[in-house]
C-alpha cells in the first residue's frame, strides 16, 4: 500500500499527487483578493487548454459535483420553447435526459447500445425530421463503459443544422486534446476531479461568449444559474455568488501547474494511453477481455467482461483493496463487467503491480 492509502484506479475521484494534497492543509478566505485572483487565473488557464481562440470563450466555475455543472447548463442554456436532442449510450447520457425531463424541457433521444458509439446516421435522421430541436448534447467519454463518442461528427452535424452544441467532457477534458472552437462546441462541461487531477468540489463550463450572453434570465434554478454565476465572476474579479470550495480551488490550481509541468494535455494523454494499452495487454494475458472495441476505447477507463467460471467481483474488489488498489464495479445492465481506470497519478509500474497481484492468484485461483 502506498502513502496515498489506496491507489484509486477509478475515473474520478482519482489518485492525486502529494503536492496537490498539501496545498489543502491551509485555510483560505473566500473574499481574499489573492484567492479571487487565483480563481481568475484558473478560469483563464481552462480556456487556454480548451482552444487557441481564447477571446471567443469564457469559463464559469460552479460549486458541487460535475453533475451540478451539467444541470446548470441544461437548466440555463435551453429556453422555455427550446428542444434538446440527447445522444446517449450510457448512464451519463441518460442522466442528461432525466435532467431535461425534470426541468420540463422538451427532449428527444438518440440511443445506442452501451458498447457502441453514437450513431451519426440516426442523429442526422432525427435532425432532418424534427425541426423544433434547438440544442444537441453528447457525452464525450461515457465512463459507464469507457467508450469514446464521435464529438467531432456530432458537433459538425449540429452546426450544419443550426443547433447549439453541448458536450459533457467530464472524464476527457485535460486528458484528451480538444479544441472547442475547431469542433464548434458552444458549451463544454467538466470537473475538478478528473483529468486535471484535482479533487472533488466544483465543476466548470467553458462557454462560447455569444451563446452564454443569450442565457440571461433563462435559468430554472437560483444556485445553478449559469449566466448569473458567470456575470458575478466576470464583473467582480473572480468572486463566487455563494461560498466557494476554497481548498479545492487551491488544489485545482496546483493540479493545473502540474499538468503544465508534465508537458500539457498531449503528454498526459500519452501517459493515459500507454497505461490503458498496458492494462489491456496484461489483463489479456490472464484471461480478461475488454468490453469495448479497441477503435472506440478511451484511454480513461476500461470495462472488462467477467471471465467464465466462479468469478466474484466483490472478492476481486476486497482482495485488491487489501493490496492497496480500488477499482470500479460495472455499470451496464446487459453484460457483467467491472471497470479499471488509469487516470490520475498512475504510472506504468502501478498497472504492472495491479495485474501482478491478480496473476499471482491473489484474486483468481
From Swiss-Prot:
Keyword Transferase included in the entry's annotation: yes
- This entry's Enzyme Commission designation comes to 2.6.1.37
The record, for Pfam families, names: Aminotran_5
Question: Which GO annotations describe the biological process of this protein?
Answer: organic phosphonate catabolic process
Spell out which residues are annotated as carrying N6-(pyridoxal phosphate)lysine. Answer: 194
Which InterPro entries does the record match to this protein? Aminotrans_V_dom, NH2EtPonate_pyrv_transaminase, PyrdxlP-dep_Trfase, PyrdxlP-dep_Trfase_major, PyrdxlP-dep_Trfase_small, SP_NH2Trfase/AEP_transaminase
Keywords, sorted A to Z: Aminotransferase, Pyridoxal phosphate, Pyruvate, Transferase
Catalytic activity entry: (2-aminoethyl)phosphonate + pyruvate = phosphonoacetaldehyde + L-alanine
- MF terms in GO: 2-aminoethylphosphonate-pyruvate transaminase activity
Instruction: Look up keyword Protease and say if it applies.
Output: no
- What broad class of enzyme is this? transferase
As cofactor, the record names:
pyridoxal 5'-phosphate
The record's family statement is:
Belongs to the class-V pyridoxal-phosphate-dependent aminotransferase family. PhnW subfamily.
| General function of this protein | Involved in phosphonate degradation.
Q: What does the annotation say about its assembly with partners? A: Homodimer.
NCBIfam families attached to this UniProt entry: PhnW-AepZ, PRK13479.1, transamin_PhnW
Q: What is this protein called?
A: 2-aminoethylphosphonate--pyruvate transaminase
* Organism name: Bacillus cereus (strain 03BB102)
Gene encoding the protein: phnW
Amino acid at each position: 500500500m502506498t502513502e496515498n492509502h489506496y491507489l484509486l484506479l477509478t475515473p474520478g475521484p482519482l489518485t492525486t499527487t502529494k503536492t496537490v494534497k498539501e496545498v489543502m492543509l491551509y485555510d483560505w478566505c473566500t473574499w481574499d483578493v489573492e484567492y479571487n485572483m487565483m480563481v481568475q487565473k484558473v478560469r483563464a488557464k481552462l480556456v487556454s487548454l480548451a482552444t487557441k481562440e481564447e477571446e471567443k470563450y469564457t469559463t464559469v466555475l460552479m460549486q458541487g459535483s460535475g453533475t451540478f455543472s451539467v444541470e446548470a447548463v441544461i437548466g440555463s442554456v435551453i429556453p422555455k420553447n427550446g428542444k434538446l436532442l440527447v445522444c446517449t449510450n450510457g448512464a451519463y447520457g441518460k442522466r442528461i435526459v432525466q435532467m431535461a425531463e425534470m426541468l420540463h424541457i422538451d427532449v428527444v433521444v438518440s440511443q445506442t447500445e452501451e458498447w457502441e458509439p453514437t450513431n451519426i446516421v440516426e442523429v442526422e435522421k432525427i435532425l432532418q425530421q424534427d425541426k423544433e430541436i434547438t440544442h444537441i448534447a453528447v457525452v464525450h467519454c461515457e465512463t459507464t463503459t469507457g467508450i469514446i463518442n464521435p464529438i467531432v461528427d456530432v458537433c459538425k452535424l449540429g452546426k450544419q443544422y443550426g443547433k447549439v452544441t453541448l458536450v459533457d467532457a467530464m472524464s476527457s477534458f485535460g486528458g484528451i486534446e480538444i479544441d472547442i472552437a475547431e469542433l464548434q462546441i458552444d458549451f463544454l462541461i467538466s470537473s475538478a476531479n478528473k483529468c486535471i487531477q484535482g479533487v472533488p468540489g466544483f465543476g466548470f463550463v467553458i462557454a462560447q461568449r455569444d451563446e452564454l450572453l443569450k442565457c440571461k434570465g433563462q435559468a430554472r434554478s437560483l444556485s445553478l444559474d449559469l449566466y448569473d454565476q458567470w456575470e458575478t465572476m466576470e464583473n467582480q474579479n473572480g468572486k463566487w455568488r455563494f461560498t466557494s470550495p476554497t481548498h479545492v480551488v487551491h488544489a485545482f490550481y496546483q493540479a493545473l501547474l502540474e499538468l503544465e509541468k508534465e508537458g500539457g494535455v498531449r503528454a498526459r494523454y500519452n501517459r493515459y494511453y500507454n497505461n490503458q494499452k498496458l492494462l489491456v495487454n496484461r489483463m489479456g494475458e490472464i484471461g480478461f477481455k475488454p468490453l469495448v472495441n479497441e477503435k472506440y476505447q478511451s484511454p480513461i477507463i476500461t470495462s472488462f467482461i467477467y471471465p467464465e467460471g466462479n468469478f466474484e467481483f466483490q472478492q476481486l474488489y476486497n482482495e485488491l483493496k487489501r493490496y492497496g488498489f480500488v477499482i470500479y464495479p460495472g455499470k451496464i445492465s446487459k453484460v457483467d463487467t467491472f471497470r479499471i481506470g488509469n487516470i490520475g497519478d498512475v504510472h506504468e509500474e502501478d498497472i504492472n503491480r495491479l495485474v501482478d497481484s491478480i496473476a499471482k492468484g491473489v484474486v483468481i485461483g
